[in-house]
Amino acid sequence: MYLMLKSLLGKIVYYSYFVILKPIPQKFYKYIIIILEKFILYTKKISMGHTIIVDQQIKNISFKIYVRKNNSQAHYVYTQLLDGKKIYEPSIIVCLNSILKNEKKPVFADVGAFVGHYSCYVSKFLNYDLPVYALESNDKFCEDIKKSASLSKISNIEVLNCLLSDKKEELFAYDVTVMNPDELQKKKLVDSDYLKKVLKFGKKKFTTTMDDVFKKKKIIPNILKMDVHGAEGKILFGSKNLLKKNVNYLLMELHTSKDLEKYSPGFTKADIIKGLIDLDFNCHIISPHSDGHRNLIATDRTTQQSYLNNTSKLKYLKIEKDLTASVLYDRNFSDIFILAIKKEINITSLDCF
């Protein structure tokens, strides 16, 4: 019923605009476009002042996401998914499906869990009592994850509110990032207005390492998903024991060199890949992922379903250690989806390839 009403409303709006615009001289169209774009922008800003609950349905898996008011990034992502036709980051979901089926006893950790999309999805997919770990630096997002889990009737997500790094230090958690504002200011990597927001609204806390977080746990993850907006260098180099001894799969968004310079100073993309290879992983670039403009939502439902059903296969490019810099050289316009797999596991054992 919802889709029928939406289609009918779309037709009414289209024909109404057609009737209104037809008599107007074409030279005025550019001004009309500017006005409409501003109208859409203001509408989005107003909508962000409200909390929304977004129903997610990925094949036979259903869950809910709690999107708090004024969470601009969550509103940007999830308002695109309200009609239920598309899913977020389909390539990662498809790859994750194959891994969860392939691993004998999967234990999942969502590093940079945001509002709980992957944590809720994996919990529903596995449907057992082992914990799903959701690691998040932002206090408010941690509360959002708990609300998403509660709305989805999920009880096995363990939310870990922590700032991760490669060593013990004091950093600020602000929005989706963790940073040292003094270092950013010294290197002039962000503007002064942004720094003022960080200092005013950010939370200053001591960091820990992922090795230390899971040293205290009886059940250790063997699958990691990581989206930490440029902090992946510092976090991974503080996770060497976990990666070496326990993790079989790492699904990671490798961010741009600019993001790494801000949030993982001293680490390059090549450092990260070579570090993983030294820890007995094979690293692969997976496509499709982004269209180059950070658009991480499938262009159409048919394409999305073909990957979910494995009738279309993901493509991979293995990164050889001595060619790492060359392979990554011209891939800096958007985030890259990296799948790192322990060397004894053949990537072709995953049915998404």
Stretches with model-predicted labels:
Residues V122-N127, S239-V247, L276:
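Short, conserved loop/helix-junction motifs that constitute active-site signature segments
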Residues K146-K147, L151-N180:
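Core alpha/beta nucleotide-donor-binding catalytic domains of modification enzymes
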Residues Y2-I154, K196-K200, K217, I285-F353:
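S-adenosyl-L-methionine
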Residues K258-K269, R294-T302:
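Short, flexible/disordered intra-domain loops and linkers
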Residues Y78-A109, E158, K167-F172, P181, ...:
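Short internal loop-to-helix segment that lines adenine-nucleotide cofactor pockets
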Residues V247-H255:
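Conserved beta-strand signature within the Rossmann-like core of class I S-adenosyl-L-methionine
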Residues L160-C162, F281-S290:
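Conserved S-adenosyl-L-methionine
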